[in-house]
Regions:
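FIC/Doc superfamily catalytic core
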Residues: 1-12, 17-29, 34, 40-316
Length: 316
């Protein structure tokens, strides 16, 4: 009988030598023998079949979120994401609801004991944001279009006091020019063109972590809506992270100053602060993956972080 080496089998089957060695050790290749310290593999041996994936084991964070959402599983990754993402993104924009109050609204669909000085819009927009996250999870694979972005805004601002103002366009671009701090934003009349150009760029851009943040910075500079831009922008980040296998991140309220300063510095040509802040936000999600038993997804996320950092280093 003719035999081939591990290296020859690896080349023939399109596997790594290490994978072939593991198959030999596990007895997955009929007729294999050990000669000295080397495996001898029958030359006519067929490639061992791929080990079937364990049923129910999610291959991505998106799969895990979809499974938990559809199964109405309490106290898991989906549950935590809804509460933490919603609380922090709203708090960055000035919401007075506490995390505990946010949790109560999500879990019970009731107000509970909320002080009378909390604006009604804080409650309405919190409930709306839960729905926005559900939309993002269920439609993460969809193309990012102007219609998609406008729909997120419509969901977020539905039923708010803003929605009753004649000059406020719910689910539509701003009618009046606005500013963000000292930053001039895109004039209202130029928003449709600016958004079309931005989304066309993103459609053809390499889907890297850094390019995703560039999309976010440019979206915030356009500031296409009269209000709600930050929250819609962060929902877009969540959607595109889930779609393209990038670990999503939560900008915690205590990161707010670093986040805003990072946005400003990015526009001035310095990207490190925003990158570091958002990577810290990824660490929050990775910790959640570990806590809820998604160890494989946590390792996958850490490996993706390392690759992203390596690309950044090689580009410098």
């Amino acid at each position: 009988m003719k035999y081939m080496s591990v290296a020859e089998a690896a080349g023939k089957w399109g596997l790594t030598p290490r994978s072939v060695q593991i198959h030999c050790q596990r007895g997955n290749i009929p007729g294999v023998t050990m000669l000295g310290k080397s495996w001898q593999i029958p030359a006519d041996a067929a490639r061992p079949p791929r080990k079937p994936r364990a049923k129910g084991l999610p291959r991505s964070i998106l799969e895990a979120l979809k499974a938990e959402k559809r199964g109405c599983i309490p106290g898991g990754l989906y549950h935590r994401l809804q509460i933490d993402f919603t609380y922090n993104t709203n708090h960055i924009e000035g919401s007075r609801l506490t995390r505990e109050q946010t949790r109560w609204i999500f879990e019970t669909q009731t107000l509970g004991e909320i002080p009378g000085d909390v604006p009604v819009d804080d409650v309405v927009e919190t409930a709306n944001h839960f729905r926005c996250i559900d939309i993002v999870i269920e439609t993460a694979g969809a193309a990012l279009t102007e219609r998609y972005v406008k729909n997120l805004h419509a969901q977020l601002k539905s039923g708010t006091t803003d929605s009753r103002k004649e000059w406020f366009e719910v689910g539509g671009y701003k009618r009046l020019d606005n500013v963000v701090g000292d930053m001039e934003t895109c004039p209202a009349k130029d928003v449709p063109c600016a958004m079309a150009e931005l989304l066309a760029w993103w459609k053809n851009a390499e889907k890297t972590f850094e390019n995703l943040l560039d999309l976010h910075v440019r979206f915030e500079q356009i500031h296409p809506f009269q209000d709600g831009n930050g929250r819609v922008g962060r929902l877009i980040l969540l959607k595109e992270c889930l779609k393209h296998g990038i670990t999503p991140f939560i900008i915690a309220d205590d990161m707010r100053q670093f986040y805003y300063l990072g946005l400003q510095e990015w526009r001035q040509g310095s990207r490190s602060r925003l990158l570091d802040t958002c990577r810290a936000g990824q660490d929050v999600v990775i910790a959640g993956l570990k806590h809820f038993g998604h160890e494989a997804l946590a390792r996958q996320a850490l490996a993706e972080q390392e690759k992203s950092e390596a690309r950044k280093t090689s580009a410098q």
